[in-house]
């Protein structure tokens, strides 16, 4: 028996120090820890309770999100506890606050089951958010190591393959959500789909809460939607689609709906974030098997992602969903009706689209991270946007995005098809101006005005919505100021 083990186990009183010992003293705080390439790293914003030592608070978060309980247990000696303990290794004050701290915590990769987001999150966010020693806690960012990423499949389709299937390049994709989201009959619902696609959109979609209600059962909706898709595709010569929401009460029902959607020719299905991580991963595996695009609506995310000091930053959700394997996820608009600071949204989009992330504190990216060849996930911009904002949308969000104009299509005074045409003409006019090297952001309103001179639907839309903005201060704003570097 090794001498150190012999010494630890020889006398009962010397085996371990029993009782309640501060987490920092137990080894959950280690300022000298050398981070390994295989470590999973998490960045928490911690607000300790009054009177709680900040060092102890960050050690407590590390302990309660890994191996600790409230008292020392002798069974620690039966494990490689020194390895398996999470290590809080760095702490920084949050700029502009006196009681908040950024705590960097490293987790041994072997603490987590391969390819299981449910298991990863059971530790990282499972119990610690209710811990009394902290007044508030927010998971701001994570670095998932290459070795652990390779146990996840990532998006089944990704940006490049989706564009190839649709034969749409060099511009954002265009979509719309059927409105009203609830109450339409199947036939009227399908008519909305046809009108939007025939007018120039690439996609129509179900909203998050349309499943299989008494006014329209799911199979009826699927059939009428696909009739609209097929007729619009035949009329325009373009590949079209409609996101069919397969969200249901059980996995068996979701598989049934997904398989039926596939059997009638749909190229895309949709799920909601509220179905849970295991269900999302299961549907992503199914989508890859059947070569279907998988769209994820982030329903419910703001219940924990919007508040500044408690919950989970949405950039973490973006990373988790890319790991799970969804092809689309709603990720903010900047200019629409929903929460979205420009820099924060840029951080979300970069987390979904870049192959390698670099530290960018202004965007909320605290770690370098290689995505290990997982495919890109297409961000979706939806919620209170209209064609008069097209120059801003193109500037903030770029090409690899789905722009979804629900009310901005279906609320057009001349009808749904005119609304779709207005959006398509506005987008193509703005992309053309950008490709010509013009200042499309500064000249945006004038570019749209000139395009509207020969497009009645666009003129009507601009006249109707020209003064509509949602200029509210975002709740989640950057903690760090973006600094311009001097060019040399």
From Swiss-Prot:
NCBIfam families linked to this entry: PRK04208.1
Pfam families tied to this protein: RuBisCO_large, RuBisCO_large_N
Function: RuBisCO catalyzes two reactions: the carboxylation of D-ribulose 1,5-bisphosphate, the primary event in carbon dioxide fixation, as well as the oxidative fragmentation of the pentose substrate in the photorespiration process. Both reactions occur simultaneously and in competition at the same active site.
Superkingdom assignment: Eukaryota
GO cellular component assignments: chloroplast
Protein localization: Plastid, Chloroplast
The species this protein was found in: Pylaiella littoralis
Keyword Repressor: no
Residues bound to substrate: 127, 177, 181, 298, 330, 382
GO BP terms, alphabetized: reductive pentose-phosphate cycle
SUPFAM superfamilies associated with the record: RuBisCo, C-terminal domain, RuBisCO, large subunit, small (N-terminal) domain
Cofactor(s) the record lists: Mg(2+)
InterPro entries named in the record: RuBisCO, RuBisCo_large_chain_AS, RuBisCO_lsu_C, RuBisCO_lsu_C_sf, RuBisCO_lsu_fd_N, RuBisCO_lsu_N_sf, RuBisCO_lsuI
Active site feature: 179 (proton acceptor), 297 (proton acceptor)
Residues binding Mg(2+): 205, 207-208
Oxidoreductase keyword on record: yes
Cofactor, free-text remark: Binds 1 Mg(2+) ion per subunit.
Paired cysteines (S-S): none
Annotated positions for site Transition state stabilizer: 337
EC number: 4.1.1.39
Family matches, as Gene3D superfamilies: Ribulose bisphosphate carboxylase, large subunit, C-terminal domain, RuBisCO large subunit, N-terminal domain
Gene Ontology MF terms: magnesium ion binding; monooxygenase activity; ribulose-bisphosphate carboxylase activity
Enzyme class per UniProt: lyase
Chief location: plastid
Family designation: Belongs to the RuBisCO large chain family. Type I subfamily.
This protein's name: Ribulose bisphosphate carboxylase large chain
């Amino acid at each position: 028996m090794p001498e150190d083990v012999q010494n630890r186990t020889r006398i009962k009183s010397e085996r371990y120090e029993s009782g309640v010992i501060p987490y920092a003293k137990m080894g959950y705080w280690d300022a000298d820890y050398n981070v390994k390439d295989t470590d999973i790293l998490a960045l928490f914003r911690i607000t300790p309770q009054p009177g709680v030592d900040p060092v102890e608070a960050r050690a407590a978060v590390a302990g309660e999100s890994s191996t600790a309980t409230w008292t020392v247990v002798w069974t620690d000696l039966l494990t490689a506890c020194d390895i398996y303990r999470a290590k809080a290794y760095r702490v920084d004050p949050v700029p502009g606050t006196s009681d908040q701290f950024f705590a960097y915590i490293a987790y041994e990769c072997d603490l987590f089951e391969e390819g299981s987001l449910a298991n990863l999150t059971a530790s990282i966010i499972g119990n610690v958010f209710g811990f009394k020693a902290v007044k508030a806690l927010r998971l701001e960012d994570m670095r998932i190591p290459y070795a652990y990423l390779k146990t996840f499949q990532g998006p089944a389709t990704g940006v490049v393959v989706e564009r190839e299937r649709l034969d749409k390049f060099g511009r954002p994709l265009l979509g719309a959500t059927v409105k009203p989201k609830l109450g339409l009959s199947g036939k009227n619902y399908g008519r909305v789909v046809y009108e939007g696609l025939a007018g120039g959109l690439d996609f129509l979609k179900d909203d998050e809460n349309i499943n299989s209600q008494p006014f329209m059962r799911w199979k009826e909706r699927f059939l009428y939607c696909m009739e609209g898709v097929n007729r619009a595709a035949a009329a325009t010569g373009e590949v079209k689609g409609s996101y069919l929401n397969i969200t249901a009460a059980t996995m068996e029902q979701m598989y049934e709906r997904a398989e039926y959607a596939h059997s009638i020719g749909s190229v895309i299905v949709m799920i909601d974030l509220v179905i849970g991580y295991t269900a999302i991963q299961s549907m992503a595996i199914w989508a890859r098997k059947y070569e279907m695009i998988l769209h994820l609506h982030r329903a419910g995310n703001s219940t924990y992602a919007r508040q500044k000091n408690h919950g989970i930053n949405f950039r973490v959700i973006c990373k988790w969903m890319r790991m799970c394997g969804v092809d689309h996820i709603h990720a903010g608009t900047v200019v629409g009706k929903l929460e979205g600071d420009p820099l924060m949204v840029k951080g979300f989009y970069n987390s979904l689209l870049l192959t390698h992330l670099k530290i960018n504190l202004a965007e909320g990216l605290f770690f370098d991270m290689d995505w290990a060849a997982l495919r890109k996930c297409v961000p979706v911009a939806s919620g209170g946007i209209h064609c008069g904002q097209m120059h801003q949308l193109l500037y903030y969000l770029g090409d690899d995005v789905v722009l979804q104009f629900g009310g901005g299509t279906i609320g057009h005074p001349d009808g749904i098809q005119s609304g779709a045409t207005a959006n398509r003409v506005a987008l193509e006019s703005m992309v053309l101006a950008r490709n010509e090297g013009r200042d499309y952001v500064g000249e945006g309103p004038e570019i749209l005005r000139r395009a509207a001179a020969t497009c009645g639907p666009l003129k009507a839309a601009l006249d109707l919505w020209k003064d509509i903005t949602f200029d509210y201060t975002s709740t989640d704003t950057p903690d760090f100021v973006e600094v311009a570097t001097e060019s040399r």
